């Protein structure tokens, strides 16, 4: 399965939804090595992901995350940033706090800094916030105070497997800059 997906990607052919789902499932189940994950990331970066492939990857990643279902009447907001800002402060975290203070329920996704001065997890830890919440704790906080931090490594197990390869490569792929904020 992996070899056919890599072959298609390096030949600049589009992946089907099923191929993407199979790949994400294989990553989640540790059926693909870190080197193979990195190979796919580079091949996809070189080819350029189509809108359909981005949608398929985001959908597959969402179906493989830890679900949250807080009991709130309003739509739940997320202010996940894309990382690598212009050497400014962490805008996505500040936005989450302001939105929650205005009464909008927020599930603020984020992680540690990879390419910027401070990731959301770094900022919140510096403020004394517990970032290692269980799904039940996050749901309760959203219901009671209107905001919870959703630490990506705990809620997105597949992302935990693709980001180390991206970090080792020293390049940004769609997983960090596009897929992360979408899921």
Label for each model-derived stretch:
Residues 81-83, 110-116, 155:
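Acidic, glycine-rich active-site loops and adjacent beta-strand->loop/helix elements
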Residues 137-183:
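Phosphate/diphosphate-binding glycine-rich loops and adjacent basic-rich segments that engage nucleotide
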Residues 1-88, 106:
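Acidic, glycine/proline-rich low-complexity segments that act as flexible tails and inter-domain linkers
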Residues 83-86, 112, 121, 182:
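Gly/Ser/Thr-rich beta-alpha loop segments that engage phosphate groups in nucleotides
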Residues 78-79, 106-110, 131-134, 149-151, ...:
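General beta-strand structural signal in soluble alpha/beta enzymes
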Residues 41, 90-145:
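A glycine-rich phosphate/pyrophosphate-binding beta-strand-loop-alpha-helix module
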